[in-house]
Amino acid sequence: MSNPLLTFTDLPPFSAIKPEHVKPAVEKAIEDCRARIDAVLVGNAEPSWESVIAPIEEVDDRLSRIWSPVSHMNSVMNSDELRDAYESCLPILSEYSTWVGQHKGLFEAYKAIKASKAFATLSRAQQKTITDGLRDFELSGIGLPAAEQKRYGEISKRMSELGSKFSNNVLDATMGWTKHVTDVNELSGMPESALAAAQAAAEAKGLEGYLLTLDIPSYLPVMTYCDNQALRQELYEAYVTRASDRGPNAGNWDNSEIIAEQLKLRHEISRMLGFNTYSEKSLATKMAESPEQVLGFLNNLAAKAKPQGEREVEELRQFAEQEFGVTALNLWDIAYYSEKQKQHLFDISDEELRPYFPEHKVVSGLFEVLNRVFGMGVKERQGVDTWHESVRFFDIFDSEGTLRGSFYLDLYAREHKRGGAWMDECRVRRINGEGELQTPVAYLTCNFNRPVGNKPALFTHDEVVTLFHETGHGIHHMLTQVEVGSVSGINGVPWDAVELPSQFLENWCWEEEALAFISGHYETGEPLPKAMLEKMLAAKNFQSAMFILRQLEFGLFDFTLHTTYDPEQGPKVLETLADVKKKVAVLPSLEWNRFSHSFSHIFAGGYSAGYYSYLWAEVLSADAFSRFEEEGIFNRETGLSFLNNILEMGGSEEPMELFKRFRGREPQIDALLRHSGIAA
């Protein structure tokens, strides 16, 4: 029988892909990759880009185009069969990656190309590919003795298994807890939209009443609006103890051992490669230059934000006491009373804004921003094969009418879909072996409430910001003009610069001129009224220091954990978290909180010793946007400068150079502090 993963040439045939196709396709693609590498090196006395790198890129691209839909479906349509198929491929992909990274012949060929006269005639993207490649050989243990190389391979394989297991445990633990409520009085204070969603969730399971889950669209409204403190506490405890040794499902899907083993292996592999800590190894491929620089950056920001964070908490305490007679605030009370305080101060709530952000208006408004700033047009394409009937497909064209890229949009939360929001690549822009241009394709994935009854999906303003964020990643991937796959789009971009375009695009969600067409009441079409807009903008920096301190807590926890790990003492996960909280947290912490056990970013998502990247890139994005504030948020010339210098360049040059070209100077932290309402 033919295998659709091996025969498709354009977009992935999602509806035809079955779990049994996965492993044979990946094995065949890897076999072809190995054969190609051996073939191009045989008798090749003068290795060149054309004779070595281009032919290998061709087969590598095929492997990633086969693996991408499999990996994506494992995240958005997870099933036991697909999960098994996906996991059966992780060891062989890891083995292949190590084999390439430790291939002496290939390493020598790269060195020969770098040393050749022809190197100077290669494009910047080609040169960067070779330079990055040589660095990656070193980081794959090319210089290690054979026994250590073998150990490196074993560790790499095990680490990819552990990351996948961690992720599965979080997904299973999230789906493994629900709360069935039959008495609507227990849900007093909850918005209509959340009640309707909980009712629909119960109906789908054949239950009366309401079903609450730990998915964010279900969990957050309870924490924010539900008057029932006992219910808030119950959900909070279930949520912060997912995949751990505590809470209602204690010991089920427990990630404790996985975390311990990951930290041990990360440390071992780093020492093997000559680094003191995993943090040092992590920075070898990033913009930041040293662990001291990162910790200095985080601690400096914490020092600026903490006094204001303490004031914000004190104001919340006073408010809860004066207005509600509450003298002790528990962690499951914070979101609830914060929302009440926000309403009291600004007379605005997320729920009042929701009717003004129906899906069709937000999506078309997003496309209008891309058009006004970058001159891009977005058109929906019908009839594209997808993994779920609610998924849509779009093409992006530039002002000349040239197709620049395409993307799948998967907006709604559902069972068997990983939580959160992300962008991933389906395929990359490159010139293929036949000399034809392959246009880039992205997946944009969110977890918003779906339409209920005859109402369209209505988004909170936070969700609008999330959609813009992921689209920012998307345009970085899709608008690239680089034609070498390994540095095209988001490829080859250091992790601490990759959030620049995503956080940058969020800014338009706060601009009156943009909100005029991003918003429109789902019944009347009326844009967000000026009075509401002013309240929303006034509330923008409500508890902003508390938010930044939470991000600093994540960033410092991650970086400290990987900087101070000592194999003699083992993982000090909870102790590290407690120490960091003492330094930066302004809210009390509970001994049984197991936030670390579902921190997928650093244990399953590539942000290990790198979570600081969000705040690092926030400095870049706020400063980049400040040029638009000076020159006009829809100034096409400024937009094209960002397009030409940042988005189109992908990973073909160092991000600091690209930033300076756009901004005319190095980044400054002032704009971030100003945007966050924090005194410099």
Q: Where are the predicted features?
A:
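C-terminal, non-catalytic "cap/extension" segments appended to globular domains
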Residues: M1-H21, K28, A197, G209-L211, ...
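His/Asp/Glu-rich acidic catalytic environments and adjacent acidic regulatory segments
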Residues: M1-K28, C33, S75, L82-E289, ...
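Membrane-entry segments of alpha-helical transmembrane domains in multi-pass membrane proteins
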Residues: F14-V26, S48-I53, G251-N255, V294-L301, ...
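C-terminal non-catalytic alpha-helical accessory regions
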Residues: I30-T121, Q551-L561, Y565-K582, S589, ...
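Active-site-proximal, well-structured secondary-structure segments within enzyme catalytic domains
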Residues: A125, T129-T131, R158-E161, N168, ...
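Short histidine-centered catalytic/ligand-binding loop motif
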Residues: P191, T224, L231, E351-P358, ...
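Short small-residue beta-strand/loop micro-motif enriched in glycine and branched aliphatics
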Residues: P221-V222, S290-P291, P451-P456, G485
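Short pre-active-site segment immediately N-terminal to the catalytic Zn-binding motif
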Residues: N449-F468
